């Protein structure tokens, strides 16, 4: 700074605005000229960095920033204030504050260069009036002190206008954007015959921006009404959309329509009285036994082998199947297999007695047993196979239990 001072102050013939003197008289003269220039005091302590000339004036910080295009960094740190041109609508003045009042040239502690870069002329978004003579300085009282806030003009133009920023979300409480979102949702919905989306009534109180890809279309809600008739559409009444009447719903595909018809037919078959196969006991008549034999054989021909655990508990299995199918027939996809008919108590008892005598049957003995319990040859063979597997499993568990009982794990 000493070299610069010696270069700038060789002679007393320089004007006052070109001096870098550290004397308090020169600085007070500069501060007085800044105060009398019409821009008012800076609001800082002791009439500090005054606002004047052609730069931006920040009322909340008391800082005057000269424009970087007209005032280079080396000159504004020394207090050289040339007359500014009328390129922008900025008043020309004999001096403008580069440092604080009463401070030396080296005390430019507010760091003007990064803020000047932020308010650079090509990057700034201040409105530029048409070229013309600069108006006289405005004579108005200084603005009242207010909390720090960014300049509104510097942030209003921060993005280019051709960037599609507003297409990614929609404030549902604005009336001009709601038809756009509703039309887009109607185009995106795979079933466009549903009711129109009522998206404008969603955010009337909150005003939260909802992304554009999260549009509430009726595709997922109405797809639940496949197996339940009008039940799916009635459940939508609690949501933001009006309930869709069952008659106006979309047409079911032929495969789904046939599947729903089969499900309804099976429900009616379940609600009907049980078949006589379950009712035939040890004291049934000959005619009832023949009907039971025919129905059970037909059911067994169409169904694969039943498991042994379900045969051992026919009452619990029948009750659980009837309740489970009535409760979950509209939740799960049903297979094409018919409902398995478990063996009756009489049939299970006869088969168990024969198994105690002989675990393996010949074909002649198997035919005799099948005639006595009114089952087919294949049913008896499968029952004996399952019973042997069950016995093998029980023997293995008992052996493991005996082995572990010999060890003390205390």
Swiss-Prot record:
UniProt entry tagged with the keyword S-adenosyl-L-methionine: no
Location of region: Disordered: 89-158, 221-339
One GO MF term: DNA-binding transcription factor activity, RNA polymerase II-specific
Residue ranges, compositional bias (Pro residues): 130-151
Cellular localization per UniProt: Nucleus
Coiled-coil spans in chain: none
DNA-binding recorded as keyword: yes
Name of this protein: Homeobox protein Hox-A10
GN (gene name): HOXA10
């Amino acid at each position: 700074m000493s070299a610069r001072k010696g270069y700038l102050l060789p002679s007393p013939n320089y004007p006052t605005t070109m001096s870098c003197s550290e004397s308090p008289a020169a600085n007070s003269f500069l501060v007085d000229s800044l105060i009398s220039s019409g821009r008012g005091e800076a609001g800082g302590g002791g009439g500090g960095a005054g606002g004047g000339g052609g730069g931006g004036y920040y009322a909340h910080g008391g800082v005057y920033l000269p424009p970087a295009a007209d005032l280079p960094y080396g000159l504004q740190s020394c207090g050289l204030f040339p007359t500014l041109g009328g390129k922008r609508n900025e008043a020309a003045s004999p001096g403008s504050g580069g440092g604080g009042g009463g401070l030396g040239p080296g005390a430019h502690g507010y760091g003007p260069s990064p803020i000047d870069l932020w308010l650079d002329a090509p990057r700034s978004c201040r409105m530029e009036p048409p070229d013309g003579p600069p108006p006289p300085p405005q004579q108005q009282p200084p603005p009242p002190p207010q909390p720090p806030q960014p300049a509104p003009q510097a942030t209003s133009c921060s993005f280019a206008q051709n960037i599609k920023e507003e297409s990614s979300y929609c404030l549902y409480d604005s009336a001009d954007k709601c038809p756009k979102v509703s039309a887009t949702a109607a185009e995106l919905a795979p079933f466009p015959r549903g009711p129109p989306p009522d998206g404008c009534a969603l955010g009337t109180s909150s005003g939260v921006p909802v992304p554009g890809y999260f549009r509430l279309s009726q595709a997922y809600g109405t797809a639940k009404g496949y197996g339940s008739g009008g039940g799916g559409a009635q459940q939508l009444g609690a949501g933001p959309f009006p309930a869709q009447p069952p008659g106006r719903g979309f047409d079911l595909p032929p495969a789904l329509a046939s599947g729903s018809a089969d499900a309804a037919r099976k429900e009616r078959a379940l609600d009907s009285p049980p078949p006589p196969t379950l009712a035939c006991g040890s004291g049934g008549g000959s005619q009832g036994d023949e009907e039971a034999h025919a129905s059970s054989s037909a059911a067994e021909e169409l169904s694969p082998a039943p498991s042994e655990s379900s045969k051992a508990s026919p009452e619990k299995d029948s009750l659980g199947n009837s309740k489970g199918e009535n409760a979950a027939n509209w939740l799960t996809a049903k297979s094409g297999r018919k409902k398995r008919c478990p063996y009756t108590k009489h049939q299970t008892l006869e088969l168990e007695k024969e198994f105690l005598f002989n675990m393996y049957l010949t074909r002649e003995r198997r035919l005799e047993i099948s005639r006595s319990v009114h089952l087919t040859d294949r049913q008896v063979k499968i029952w004996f196979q399952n019973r042997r597997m069950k016995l093998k499993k029980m023997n293995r568990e008992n052996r493991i239990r005996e082995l572990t009982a010999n060890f003390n794990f205390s």
